[in-house]
Structure formats: structure tokens, C-alpha cells
């Protein structure tokens, strides 16, 4: 859009065409290739691929999920907020994608189950040490909403996904306020903690008017690179 505006102002007919001094070959970024591959794996595991907004409200990102802003929990990063938001529904960049998936489930309670949804998308948090004061990463999130959803279901699909990319997965027990005590684990890939897996806490389900159990996981995409 910017180049188009400059071209119109200068006059496209006044531009002198010339070949560039160097030759380049176009190609897709490795991250884009990885995203497509992981997306295909998720669909193969039975998930419906979603594309959601990267903007969210603080109430949805933290409050309704039971997460404390600024905490060390997955999704607890400090928010990157909008100074004058157009809508109170979109006041910040989301720090994790799971709240977006839970909102989709909330808006589809009138539909039949199971509902297994997943997304690969952007997450960001405020970081004073970063040059831009923002750190961004691509995240993989998935949720299983069904009458028999359990931690074991989510972990099994997580294991299958990681097996596709030949990475070493460990799931030590952890506490996370969005999940049931004793039914949550860290996602540790090749020795690094990159996410969480577990069953959503009943408080979160009630907050979103969900009447079936929901098991979910979320982790950093680059863990599979």
C-alpha cells in the first residue's frame, strides 16, 4: 500500500524501469514451511484449523482464564496494550492463543460435539529489555471439547504431533491456574519448557458456559524446528 501511494504521487509513467543490480531467487520462509507442515499434522490428528484475531481484551486473555498478568505461567506475560482501542474487545495483543480457542468453543455451544479445534498464530508480550519492548512468537494451540475429553487425550495428540518432528517430549506435572490441579503438565521439548497441556479448570468452563470437559495444549512453534 505504501509503495502504491508513493507511485501514484510520483507518477507511475515517470518511473524509469531498470533491472536490479543483484539477482535474487524468491522462496518461502522456513517458518512458513514449518507452519504449513504442523497445520497439516494437526488436521491429520482430527483438529479443525482456525484463524483468529491476534487482538483480544485483557478480561479474555487473563481474567476469564484465571491467569494473573505478569506471572510466569504460560499466557501470563505482561500485555502489549493499545492506547486508544477502537473496541473494548480488542485492547491488547494476546499473550497466548488458548483463550481465543475457548472463545470459539463458547460461541459454538449450540453445535454438536466433539469439537476439536487448533490454531497456529501470533502471541506477544511486553519486554522492557527488547529493542522494541515487545517479544513475539508463533504458538501452536489446540483444544478438545467433548463429553469424554481428558488430559490423556490432549497428551496423546501432543505426543503424536511431536513424533512427526522427531523431538524429545517430556510432560512433568505442573500447576497452572487455567487447568485442574493434578491434571496439567509442562510441555518440555528437548529439555526446554515451551508450553502446557491439561484439562481446563471447571471455573474456566463455567465462565465460558461450556458444559463439556475441555482438554488442551499450547506450546511454541519453534520447538518443532
List each language-model region with its residue ranges.
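Extended beta-strand-rich architecture
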Residues: 1-225
